[in-house]
């Protein structure tokens, strides 16, 4: 055995390749072994280096891994019909084994038999024991480990008897030791590169083969001091490994020396070495300004700015002749950076390969199985059924996607949930697409549908039967046909990566089903158990990753770094929390148990002590990282990471303490002093134009020369890029609307406008809202809560029927109310049983009704105010109050109550489920049209009677704070005080109205006859103005905005506060407020009244 070592600043691979070439010249076969985590990249690197020489040399050199070696020497075919279980199959077998135990046998772990996390930990423990050359008998004695021994022993027994799983590598090592391959090995050279430590399994293999081959070489990193310094060294793992080998067999140990060393990386390495040994150097180590060419530390504003900094530098170096493959980006948190990094690199047109394993969990086929399981577990929840159909894997023949949208709309609108409701015909006949939706329901969810045939039973079946039934579902539900279609379409569109994903997922399903049959074929399971087992394998599966192109930027986790990785290295996202990365032991064996095992086992048997190993790994990872670049290394940290303030890691602090100030660079989002070569590409400049312009404005006095530079860049972009020209032209009118044509106006409106009063209040809130909701009839889903329309209708119907009861009096009021509640409840019950929110609302309705009814009871008992009509309509067929129009606008609506004073004055009562009061400002701005319209209708319907006004009555269940009262007897009075009418009253009826109990009239809402007529005229003017706008085809996006309120905490102006249509109009308050809003609330009440008495209002 030869062990060659060199310092990590040197190129170890170069020296090992020289040895490999020497061996190839001797006609020996060279097996070049590298760690599994970097085998692909290492193989590419080695072949590229060897390509400079003779082509024949490559043929006899194989870059491989330890576990692949049996394949090259053992050519025997496996004569077995047994199934070999993969990770998913092993998890299934562990699940089956756990189900075979009683609670008394494994009390600690019995409840975890279906826990995916626990199953994964069992697989991990078994793998660790195999790698450590240990068995379950080596586990320390404790109640927990006694249970683990039972589980693992029964598992190994089942595995050995029924399956083809065995350790090929372990078997190969045993046969090596028996001399079975001596003849094949006599002309073989084995070279091992990149290891500083080996597992027990690997060390046993090395012991068995090292004296049977022509030459056995291990190349590693160390120095003379580390081989004698014990634990005080940065190469501690290497020194321990060399020490073990030298104690077992003869080792030729020698140092490989090279001449060229980049001094800055040598400095960084020395700093780490001194820090690890807590030593102080006699010689001052300083990273000076000249070293900034090779090494820098970035402090970026945030992740986005950090990634853009990398992208700009890559584009700069590409313009100078570099290749994309010369760059490697190392990431501190691959998952957190993935989306942003991909978006920015695509913006800068940088090809890349992101070495982050992608889960199959988002593939439509996996979503289909996930929805199947959720449907069965949650009894056909609305969202689960919709997700199943939206996966577009389970479909009817020629199913139109639009029909799925209709189906989703229907089930969401009518709160369809539960198996019974989905298997029975939908019966809301007013839904225009009811036939299409019912056809889809019948074909895909009906009693005879493939889904129901598969899920319809709750009885247990054997695993074999479940797989057979699933195959029927996949065929009859067109799942197989759809998967083939997806694959073919992706291939035909040259989307080969997507086609490969479709194929991988399908092959994974087949593999899991085969392993399921091998494990659970004769076991009886329920459908939920079957789907849960199946889904566990699918959701944990990963896609194979193969770079699509050679000339790409490689992006990967910084822990996968090795020395001399590439020319240019950018290590980003390195903060105190992840550099170095602190890992906790989350396995089934504690660090103390691992230490106990290692103290009691034989030679070539040891398990990793994670607390020790992780420390050594972190140390070597940092060492590898600072020596990973051949030309330039950048270490970077964002100031804000995951919405938290980032802090420099101890490694950064160490380097900065010995660095010139030029080594640390602040990376900003906009840097006006960047030159032409730093700005990336035209697309990135276009994306930054707004921020650059803002920066120029804020620093106008200091940056006149930079304004000239950037203005020149913008002019060039405008001239050379027609798309950019279009963007600039559209910026000022990105939400401008287009006037409707006369032909369209004739179709949607005709000669006369028919609309409700409330719709015109929406018009004055925002014209575009009126257009979408009233003209186009766009509806939003309504959840049934205390403010929903259904609840409002419920209240109105209850009080309408109560007030219409014959011989109604204060004495029989409660009795008649109870009867009406019972009748109305039966009519509305279907609306209030759809979901939990609706059921909760229903439980509160009676309390609200009864508390509000106390006011009505008072009204019934007084002679001063009597109800003439309830729910009296106008503008509808057979309306009690006839038609009502303003010019050619025909209005419709209902007045909840028409009440008459003892003096014969008439007025209106309007019920509301939320707080309302009459505000002159809202009437002036067109936001409150109801009261004045109702009074105008009454005036027209009863021309010989005078008007007293209009009042609101809110339905509510007023809470009382008991800590604020002295006696319980006060509650009734407080409740009564909270339930009051409020509105506007005419002056001549004010005294009579105020004398009635439960009515509050503010002085500001008492108007004389002249003011009343002016308000009616103002109201009519609002309708006339709206009608003119509508008939002209002018529809503006102009939500109301009160200057004193501005933009609220949700980012909205007042008109958008409760609007669900912003995704359509795309109004953004901070961008469009000044040009696309209508300002209200600018005048006082005195100013409004004065204006009404004058020339009127200018619209």
Curated annotation (Swiss-Prot):
Textual note on the cofactor? Binds 1 [4Fe-4S] cluster.
Which Pfam families has this protein been placed in?
ADDB_N, PDDEXK_1
The protein's matches in SUPFAM superfamilies, at most eight in alphabetical order, are given as: P-loop containing nucleoside triphosphate hydrolases, Restriction endonuclease-like
- Recite the lineage of the species: Bacteria, Bacillati, Bacillota, Bacilli, Lactobacillales
Q: Which UniProt keywords apply?
A: 4Fe-4S, ATP-binding, DNA damage, DNA repair, DNA-binding, Exonuclease, Helicase, Hydrolase, Iron, Iron-sulfur, Metal-binding, Nuclease, Nucleotide-binding
One BP annotation, GO:
double-strand break repair via homologous recombination
What HAMAP family would the database entry show? AddB_type2
Q: From what organism does this protein derive?
A: Lactococcus lactis subsp. lactis (strain IL1403) (Streptococcus lactis)
**Free-text function comment from the UniProt entry:** The heterodimer acts as both an ATP-dependent DNA helicase and an ATP-dependent, dual-direction single-stranded exonuclease. Recognizes the chi site generating a DNA molecule suitable for the initiation of homologous recombination. This subunit has 5' -> 3' nuclease activity but not helicase activity.
- The organism's place on the tree of life at top rank: Bacteria
Q: What is this protein called?
A: ATP-dependent helicase/deoxyribonuclease subunit B
Oligomeric state and partners?
Answer: Heterodimer of AddA and RexB.
- What molecular function terms (GO) are annotated for this protein? 4 iron, 4 sulfur cluster binding; 5'-3' exonuclease activity; ATP binding; double-stranded DNA binding; helicase activity; hydrolase activity, acting on acid anhydrides; metal ion binding
Binding, [4Fe-4S] cluster: 766, 1056, 1059, 1065
What is the gene called?
A: rexB
Q: What does the record give as EC number?
A: 3.1.-.-
What more does the record tell us? Despite having helicase-like domains, this subunit does not have helicase activity.
InterPro entries per UniProt:
ADDB_N (IPR049035), DNA_helicase_suRexB (IPR014141), P-loop_NTPase (IPR027417), PDDEXK-like_dom_sf (IPR011604), PDDEXK_AddAB-type (IPR038726), Restrct_endonuc-II-like (IPR011335)
The Swiss-Prot or TrEMBL record describes its family as follows: Belongs to the helicase family. AddB/RexB type 2 subfamily.
Which cofactors, if any, are listed as required? Mg(2+); [4Fe-4S] cluster
């Amino acid at each position: 055995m030869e062990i060659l070592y060199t310092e990590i600043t040197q190129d170890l691979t170069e020296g090992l390749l020289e040895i490999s070439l020497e061996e190839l010249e001797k006609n020996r076969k060279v097996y070049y072994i590298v760690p599994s985590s970097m085998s692909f990249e290492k193989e590419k690197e080695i072949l590229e280096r060897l390509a400079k020489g003779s082509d024949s040399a490559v043929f006899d050199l194989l870059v491989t891994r330890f576990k692949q070696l049996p394949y090259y020497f053992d050519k025997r075919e496996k004569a077995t019909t047994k199934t070999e279980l993969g990770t998913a199959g092993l998890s299934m077998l562990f699940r089956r084994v756990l189900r075979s135990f009683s609670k008394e046998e494994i009390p600690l772990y019995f409840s975890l038999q279906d826990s995916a996390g626990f199953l994964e930990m069992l697989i991990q423990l078994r793998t660790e024991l195999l790698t450590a050359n240990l068995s379950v008998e080596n586990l320390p004695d404790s109640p927990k480990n006694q249970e683990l021994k039972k589980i693992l022993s029964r598992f190994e027994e089942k595995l050995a008897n029924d399956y083809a799983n065995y350790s090929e590598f372990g078997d190969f090592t045993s046969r090596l030791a028996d001399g079975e391959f001596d003849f094949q090995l006599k002309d073989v050279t084995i070279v091992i590169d990149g290891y500083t430590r080996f597992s027990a399994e690997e060390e046993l293999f090395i012991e068995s083969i090292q004296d049977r081959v022509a030459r056995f070489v291990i190349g590693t990193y160390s120095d003379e001091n580390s081989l004698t310094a014990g634990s005080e060294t940065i190469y501690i793992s290497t020194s321990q490994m060399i020490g073990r080998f030298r104690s077992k067999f003869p080792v030729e140990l020698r140092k490989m020396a090279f001449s060229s060393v980049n001094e800055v990386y040598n400095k960084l390495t020395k700093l780490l070495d001194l820090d690890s040994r807590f030593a102080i150097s006699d010689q001052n180590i300083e990273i000076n300004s000249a070293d900034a060419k090779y090494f820098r530390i970035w402090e970026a504003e945030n992740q986005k700015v950090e990634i853009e900094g990398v992208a700009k530098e890559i584009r700069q170096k590409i313009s100078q002749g570099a290749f994309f493959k010369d760059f490697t980006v190392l990431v501190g948190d691959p998952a957190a950076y993935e989306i942003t990094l991909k978006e920015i690199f695509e913006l800068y047109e940088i090809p890349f390969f992101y070495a982050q394993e992608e889960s199959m969990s988002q593939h439509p086929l996996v979503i289909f199985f996930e929805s199947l399981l959720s449907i069965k577990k949650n009894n056909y929840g609305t969202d689960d059924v919709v997700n199943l159909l939206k996966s577009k894997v389970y479909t009817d023949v020629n199913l139109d996607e639009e029909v799925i949208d209709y189906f989703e709309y229907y089930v969401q609108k009518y709160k369809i949930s539960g198996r019974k409701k989905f298997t029975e015909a939908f019966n809301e006949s007013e839904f225009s697409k009811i036939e299409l939706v019912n056809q889809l329901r019948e074909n895909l969810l009906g009693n005879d549908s493939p889904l129901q045939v598969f899920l319809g039973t709750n009885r247990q079946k054997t695993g074999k039967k479940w797989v057979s039934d699933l195959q029927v579902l996949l065929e009859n539900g067109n799942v197989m046909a759809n998967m083939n279609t997806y694959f073919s379409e992706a291939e035909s569109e040259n989307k080969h990566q997507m086609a490969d994903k479709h194929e991988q997922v399908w092959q994974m399903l087949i593999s899991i089903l085969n392993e399921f049959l091998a494990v659970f074929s004769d076991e009886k399971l329920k459908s939920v158990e079957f789907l849960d087992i199946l889904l566990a394998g699918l959701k944990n599966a990963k896609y194979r990753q193969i770079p699509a192109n050679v000339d790409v930027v490689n992006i990967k986790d910084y822990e996968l770094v090795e020395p001399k990785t590439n020319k240019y290295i950018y290590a980003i996202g390195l903060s105190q929390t992840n550099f170095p990365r602190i890992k906790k032991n989350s396995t089934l064996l504690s660090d103390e148990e691992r230490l106990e095992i290692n103290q009691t086992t034989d030679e070539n048997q040891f398990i990793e002590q994670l607390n020790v190993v992780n420390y050594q790994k972190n140390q070597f990872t940092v060492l590898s990282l600072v020596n990973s670049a051949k030309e330039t290394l950048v270490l970077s940290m964002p100031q804000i990471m995951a919405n938290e303030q980032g802090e420099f890691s101890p490694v950064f602090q160490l380097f900065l303490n010995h660095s010139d100030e030029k080594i640390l660079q602040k990376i900003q989002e906009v840097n006006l002093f960047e030159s032409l070569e730093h700005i990336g590409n035209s697309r990135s400049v276009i994306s930054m134009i707004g921020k650059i312009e803002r920066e120029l404005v804020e620093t106008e006095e200091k940056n006149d020369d930079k304004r000239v530079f950037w203005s020149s860049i913008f002019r060039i972009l405008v001239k050379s890029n027609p798309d950019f020209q279009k963007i600039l032209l559209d910026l000022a009118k990105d939400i401008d609307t287009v006037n409707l044509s006369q032909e369209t106006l004739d179709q949607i409106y005709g000669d006369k406008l028919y609309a409700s009063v409330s719709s015109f209040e929406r018009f004055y809130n925002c014209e575009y809202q009126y257009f979408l909701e009233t003209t186009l009839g766009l509806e939003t889903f309504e959840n049934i809560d205390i403010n929903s329309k259904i609840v409002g209708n419920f209240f109105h119907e209850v009080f309408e029927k109560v007030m219409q009861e014959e011989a109604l009096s204060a004495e029989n009021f409660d009795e008649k109310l109870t009867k009406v509640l019972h009748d109305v409840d039966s009519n509305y019950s279907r609306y209030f049983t759809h979901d939990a929110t609706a059921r909760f609302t229903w439980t509160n309705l009676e309390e609200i009704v009864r508390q509000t009814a106390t006011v009505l009871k008072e009204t019934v008992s007084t002679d001063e105010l009597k109800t003439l009509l309830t729910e009296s309509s106008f503008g509808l067929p057979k309306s009690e109050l006839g038609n009502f129009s303003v010019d050619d606008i025909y209005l419709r609506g209902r007045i909840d109550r028409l009440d008459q004073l003892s003096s014969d004055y008439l007025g209106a009562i309007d019920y509301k489920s939320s707080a309302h009061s009459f505000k002159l400002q809202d009437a002036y701005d067109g936001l409150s049209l109801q009261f004045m319209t109702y009074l105008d209708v009454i005036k027209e319907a009863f021309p010989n009677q005078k008007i007293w006004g209009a009042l609101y009555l809110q339905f509510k269940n007023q809470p009382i704070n008991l800590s604020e009262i002295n006696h319980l007897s006060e509650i009734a009075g407080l409740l009564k005080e909270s339930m009051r009418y409020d509105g506007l009253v005419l002056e001549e009826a004010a005294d009579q109205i105020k004398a009635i109990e439960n009515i509050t009239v503010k002085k500001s809402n008492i108007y004389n006859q002249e003011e009343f007529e002016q308000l009616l005229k103002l109201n009519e003017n609002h309708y006339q103005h709206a009608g003119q706008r509508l008939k002209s085809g002018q529809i503006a996006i102009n939500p109301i905005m009160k200057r004193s309120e501005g933009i609220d905490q949700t980012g909205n102006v007042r008109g958008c506060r409760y609007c669900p249509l912003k995704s359509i109009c795309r109004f953004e308050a901070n961008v469009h407020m000044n040009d696309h809003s209508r300002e209200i609330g600018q005048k006082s009440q005195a100013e409004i009244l004065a204006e009404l008495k004058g020339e009127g209002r200018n619209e």
